[in-house]
Amino acid sequence: MPGPVTWLPDAEGTVTDLPVFGSASPMREVTETVAFDAAWDSSRRAKVRELFDGMAADWSSRATPEREASILDALDRGGLAGGTVIELGSGTGLGTGHLIERFDDLIALDLSMQMLRHQPDLAPKVQADASMLPFPDGAADLLVLVNMLLFPAEVDRVVRPGGGLLWINTLGHETPIHLSPEAVVDALPGSWTATAGRAGSGLWAAVQRV
């Protein structure tokens, strides 16, 4: 059953006039169909892996203070506890560098081996498909997804009772891989509630199992 989303006031310096970018990306349709229709198969997996393998070498050059602001704000105001934290879609480590400063028990996971090869050795790395996580039921206190596809059934399986999900889109509604906080809560099985906010050029949702 979907729970409520409580929006916090925008952080100081939030960018509200975002250029049209991600809403026209083919990844937007992939994001929505994967979250709501479970439309993920070996062909789509291979195409997404190839896409991100090809972008890995210069992926870190996309980092800007405005994009990172949403990650920092989510960690500051999201209110989710740590414990065992797994970052899904860790890429080359844009979020990982901030997460390792907050959480002692962190695993960085990505579908793209090339992304992981370009990521600094900040945390243990796992190359895997987030639709079939190599972790037992209830293994995580917190999952962190920065510009990452949402696989609701696996989130529901891996997050412990009382655990949570931190969902971050660093370009807000213009992030190619974007779902609104309301859509994230709606997609998840079971009962969840969320706190959401905007900072820099991005938005985030701290989603708690209830």
What residues fall within each predicted segment?
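A short acidic, Gly/Pro-enriched loop at the edge of an enzyme's catalytic core
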Residues: 131-143
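Core SAM-dependent methyltransferase catalytic element
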Residues: 196-210
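Class I SAM-dependent methyltransferase SAM/SAH-binding core
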Residues: 91-132
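A short SAM/SAH-binding and catalytic strip from SAM-dependent methyltransferases
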Residues: 141-153
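Conserved class I S-adenosyl-L-methionine
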Residues: 4-80, 82-91, 166-187
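A short glycine-rich, Lys/Arg-flanked "PGG" loop and its adjoining helix->strand segment in the class I
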Residues: 152-164
